[in-house]
Amino acid sequence: RDIRLGSGGVMLPNHQPLIVAEQFLMLEALYPGRIDLGLGRSLGFTEPVRQALRRSKDAPDTFVSDLDEVRRYLDGSAAVTARPASQSGVPIFVLATRTGLKVAAQLGLPVVVGGPILGIGSTDRVEALDEYRRAFRATDAHPEPYVVVSLEVAVADSTDAARELLIPEAYALAESSRTG
């Protein structure tokens, strides 16, 4: 009952905001106070994926307005009531690239950093997180900046064995960047 459940990341450009809100409100109804919603802005890595989602590479970026719409459905301030209604609320985390950090700061939301943002130079990484903290606009729900760091870790008896554990994931990542 103490373990939180959540999405590693719902890529918001691939979904309607009302549907995302209702899916997570249903999870919240089943597991009250234990659900987290991570929202990202990726549109799909390959052209076949973008076509399957019916989104062109040149589609307008609606992430900020869609994120705000999801937030309004979750807090009950939207013109439409997302069902089931929740009393406890579902916290939103922005899956952050450098742009995502700026959006999260403006909206007063927590961030999850990992992957690309952690791959940039250490000075840039520190600068990006410092800028998020400086630009953060406090809200009632989030009075101060909140950063979650996501790292891949492989634990084994030796370095070689740990590297071997990462091979399937590396292969899957390479394959998905090629085929979607």
Label the predicted regions:
Residues 1-5:
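N-terminal beta1-alpha1-beta2 module of alpha/beta enzyme domains
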Residues 6, 36-38, 93, 112, ...:
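Structural detector of well-ordered beta-strand residues that form the stable sheet scaffold
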Residues 9-17, 86-96, 156:
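Active-site mouth loops of central-metabolism enzymes
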Residues 10-12, 40-44, 95-97, 116-118, ...:
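Active-site beta-loop-alpha junctions enriched in small/polar residues
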Residues 13-75, 117-119:
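Flexible, glycine-rich active-site loops centered on histidine and acidic residues
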Residues 51, 57-82, 122-180:
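An alpha-helical appendage that flanks or caps ligand/catalytic pockets
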Residues 88, 104-105:
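Histidine/acidic residue-rich metal-binding segments in metalloenzymes
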Residues 99, 105-120, 125:
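A conserved active-site cap/scaffold subdomain adjacent to cofactor or substrate pockets
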